């Protein structure tokens, strides 16, 4: 019985860390996009309350947690990283997990550096995607692109050339084939202590106040999400253990996801963006608490009305490896997909898309494509046709 109680309390602590991370991101993203004075004050208060939630379970004091949260200046999304699986000459497999950051080099640079050190080929594409949120780790939400390498070095020699795994990425983190990565997290009902319920009630009151005062559709969506999170928690008597919730100051390389949806004739669905009038693959920012594959599926539905399933990963697209450096959202996970029902009609989101078109590869060459999509659209066609 004592073991069962301890396990339940541990799950509740990790769940609270996850919730705090989601609310941290909602506050940071709302502040990034800008708001009026009253809404900005509410978002800053949300940030404070999110830090107070984490202080119920993390070993660090509230002031330290809040300082980390207040340092957020960019968009917060699941953080990209790599899981390198290196098969050595002596039969040992080494595994190294590290996040990407804005200062430690691009995805392409990391792969090239590691391959050169191990005297092996640069891996061309990830074999799987791992996700710390799906694994139940309490660290900031991170997805890991899994690459496999082989080296003629033995394990001690190879290990000496590699940076160690970041401590908060240690543990059992299952990986999924990219085509199967649109997993809906099932963490169950979050059990919370009475003091946490009080904090969530305060957050829900902020959301209610925002909904009464703001007409901005994106901010209203945000506040509805926040209110739903607060409502889903269930108060109970429990005692939280103190846990390590990972590197709260880890640099977030903001990540988006898109879905290149193909029909049975091999045509690609593009939308005309309402803001620029250019053509693009449906996509947008990934949200903390959702796998990047699920973000691609969600964005396709929100912008086109189509229910889709992933068929693969076209490109883990680090814009910093191109001339399209983008401080706002440097990383894009570009998936291929198909509609679950080929007869399902399109239903465009007017705020996002003014038109949509199924196009061939040849037709795509004559379109005015949104920045970055001039690279991603040909890559999607090549992936769909099995050319890469």
Residue ranges and their predicted role:
Residues 37-83, 217-258:
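Acidic, metal-coordinating catalytic segment for phosphate/diphosphate chemistry
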Residues 2-43, 142-236, 278, 350-388:
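Nudix hydrolase/Nudix homology domain
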Residues 80, 86, 196-203, 255, ...:
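Disulfide-bonded cysteine-rich modules in secreted/extracellular proteins
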Residues 84, 259, 309, 315:
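Histidine/lysine/aspartate-rich catalytic loop segments that bind and position anionic ligands
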Residues 85-121, 263-302:
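Conserved Nudix-box catalytic region and its N-terminal flanking loop in Nudix hydrolases
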């Amino acid at each position: 019985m004592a073991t069962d109680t301890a396990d339940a309390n541990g799950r509740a602590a990790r769940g609270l860390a996850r919730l705090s991370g989601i609310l941290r991101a909602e506050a940071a993203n709302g502040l990034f996009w800008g708001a009026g004075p009253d809404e900005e004050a509410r978002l800053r208060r949300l940030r404070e309350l999110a830090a107070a939630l984490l202080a119920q379970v993390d070993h660090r004091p509230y002031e330290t947690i809040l300082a980390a949260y207040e340092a957020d200046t960019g968009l917060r999304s699941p953080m990209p990283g790599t899981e390198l699986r290196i098969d050595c000459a002596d039969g040992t497999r080494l595994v190294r997990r590290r996040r990407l950051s804005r200062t430690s080099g691009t995805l392409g640079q990391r792969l090239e550096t590691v391959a050169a050190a191990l005297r092996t080929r640069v891996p061309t594409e990830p074999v799987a995607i791992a996700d710390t949120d799906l694994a139940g780790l309490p660290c900031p939400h991170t997805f890991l692109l899994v690459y496999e390498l082989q080296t003629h070095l033995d394990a001690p020699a190879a290990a000496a050339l590699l940076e160690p795994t970041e401590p908060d990425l240690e543990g059992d983190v299952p990986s999924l084939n990219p085509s199967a990565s649109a997993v809906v997290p099932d963490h169950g009902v979050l059990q919370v202590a009475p003091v946490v319920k009080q904090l969530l009630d305060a957050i829900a009151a902020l959301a209610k106040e925002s909904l009464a005062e703001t007409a901005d559709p994106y901010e209203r969506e945000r506040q509805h999400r926040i209110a739903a999170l607060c409502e889903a928690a269930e108060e109970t008597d429990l005692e939280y253990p103190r846990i390590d919730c990972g590197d709260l100051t880890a640099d977030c390389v903001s990540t988006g996801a898109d879905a290149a949806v193909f029909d049975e004739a091999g045509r690609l669905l593009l939308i005309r963006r309402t803001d620029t009038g250019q053509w693009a693959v449906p996509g947008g920012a990934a949200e903390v608490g959702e796998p990047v594959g699920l973000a691609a599926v969600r964005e396709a539905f929100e912008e086109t009305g189509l229910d889709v399933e992933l068929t693969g990963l076209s490109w883990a697209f680090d814009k910093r490896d191109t001339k399209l450096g983008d401080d706002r959202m440097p990383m894009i996970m570009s998936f291929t997909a198909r509609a679950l029902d080929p007869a399902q009609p399109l239903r465009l989101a007017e705020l996002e898309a003014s038109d949509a078109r199924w196009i061939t590869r040849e037709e795509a060459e004559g379109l005015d494509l949104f920045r970055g999509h001039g690279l991603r659209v040909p890559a999607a066609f090549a992936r769909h046709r099995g050319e890469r």
